[in-house]
UniProtKB/Swiss-Prot annotation:
SMART domains the record matches: TGFB
Source organism: Gallus gallus
Signal peptide boundaries: 1-20
Residues glycosylated per entry: N72, N139, N240
Gene Ontology biological process terms in this record: activation of protein kinase activity; animal organ development; cardiac epithelial to mesenchymal transition; cardiac muscle cell proliferation; cardioblast differentiation; cartilage development; cell death; cell migration
Keywords, alphabetical: Cleavage on pair of basic residues, Disulfide bond, Extracellular matrix, Glycoprotein, Growth factor, Mitogen, Secreted, Signal
Name of the protein: Transforming growth factor beta-2 proprotein
GO cellular component terms attached to this protein's record: axon; extracellular matrix; extracellular region; extracellular space; neuronal cell body
Length: 412
């Protein structure tokens, strides 16, 4: 009886070794590509909060230059970030996530002196918020993350219940009334609801300011479509009807709430003193960086530099170019016409040895439960965003879609 049980165990053991060499599914490139294309279709619609592609209208003969400018600057920023990472060999993200960070709070610079009335260039359609981060310049290379936080006040008199506000990085421009800008993020807010904090990731903008002081021109808060009226609940646009921001922000719209009364202005400032717009900077202390031991040799990156020049059946990055018109049947995305989405595929074999008991247990589990395989899968590791310029009706819109471009893979 004991010999029989031993024989069964060895048979299962050897079978498990063979099974453990497989990935989550059979390597069928055509199938992987079809699934990736359909996943991208769903991703784009989901990230834009659309249930179906917008109705198609004839594209305008010429896109407004200011729209093209925003698209180009946002696209170029993403490319600069990618180039910077490749050129400087940045610290591994695992180090940044592991070590404790020091947090610094930097309040917004006041618009005007304590007893003064705002200047005449105060705009009804946008707000400019500035910060002095010069004190942090000596620690610029240690910046891990920066968040812009602003408190939305309840506006019970708001004419609309919802508005989509957008945050831009202000760029150099000849005209103060019409600054250049780079899109960062957007949020839909309920204007009449109880006040709340809104947070935006502004790491890249602050990183740029710390290295180039002259580029620190602040942030711009504006509506999604100041030249029209945008209805977030159904993505409907009313053209040629300018919309004013109904969302109010502590420390920014104090003058609006005080109706020009200096006494009321002081009262509002005191009331919301703890809710001033501010930056939260998270830095990795220098002494923690200096105390790190020299890192061990890193694993070979399963990225384009390696995978595209080596024929691999194992887990690797696979090239895939998506043409929006050809592959998705879409004409509503104006720029780009397509992009290199890529995908991960290939086997993830276990490293088998007599002392790897963990692998032995996983393999036996894989044999007993084939439908719930514990084998590692080939998945994406590094992803980059994609900027698109598209139309809803005749209105151009620019969006940055996160995690759309696969840059490297791993077994997990």
């Amino acid at each position: 009886m004991h010999c029989y049980l031993l024989s069964v165990f060895l048979t299962l053991d050897l079978a498990a070794v063979a099974l453990s060499l497989s990935t989550c599914s059979t390597l069928d490139m055509d199938q992987f590509m079809r699934k990736r294309i359909e996943a991208i279709r769903g991703q784009i619609l989901s990230k834009l909060k659309l249930t179906s592609p917008p109705d198609e209208y004839p594209e305008p003969e010429e896109v407004p230059p200011e729209v093209i400018s925003i698209y180009n600057s946002t696209r170029d920023l993403l490319q600069e970030k990618a180039n910077h990472r490749a050129a400087t060999c940045e610290r591994e993200r695992s180090d940044e996530e592991y070590y404790a960070k020091e947090v610094y709070k930097i309040d917004m610079q006041p618009f005007y002196p304590e007893n003064a009335i705002p200047p005449s260039y105060y705009s009804l359609y946008f707000r400019i918020v500035r910060f002095d981060v010069s004190a942090m310049e000596k620690n610029a290379s240690n910046l891990v993350k920066a968040e812009f936080r602003v408190f939305r006040l309840q506006n019970s008199k708001a004419r609309v219940s919802e508005q989509r506000i957008e945050l831009y990085q202000v760029l150099k421009s000849k005209e103060l009334s019409s600054p250049g800008q780079r899109y960062i993020d957007s949020k839909v807010v309920k204007t009449r609801a109880e006040g709340e904090w809104l947070s935006f990731d502004v790491t890249e903008a602050v990183h740029e300011w710390l290295h180039h002081r002259d580029r620190n021109l602040g942030f711009k808060i504006s509506l999604h479509c100041p030249c029209c009226t945008f209805v977030p609940s159904n993505n409907y646009i009313i053209p040629n009807k300018s919309e004013e921001p109904e969302a109010r922000f502590a420390g920014i719209d104090d003058y609006t709430y005080s109706s020009g009364d200096v006494k009321a202005l002081k009262s509002n400032r005191k009331k919301y003193s703890g809710k001033t717009p501010h930056l939260l900077l998270m830095l990795l202390p220098s002494y923690r960086l200096e105390s790190q031991q020299p890192s061990r040799r890193k694993k070979r990156a399963l990225d384009a530099a390696y995978c595209f020049r080596n024929v691999q059946d194992n887990c690797c990055l696979r090239p895939l170019y998506i043409d929006f018109k050809r592959d998705l049947g879409w004409k509503w995305i104006h720029e780009p016409k397509g992009y290199h989405a890529n995908f991960c595929a290939g086997a993830c074999p276990y490293l088998w040895s007599s002392d790897t008991q963990h692998s032995r247990v996983l393999s036996l589990y894989n044999t007993i439960n084939p439908e719930a395989s514990a084998s590692p899968c080939c998945v994406s590791q590094d992803l980059e965003p994609l900027t698109i310029l598209y139309y809803i009706g005749k209105t151009p819109k620019i969006e940055q879609l996160s995690n759309m471009i696969v840059k490297s893979c791993k077994c997990s």
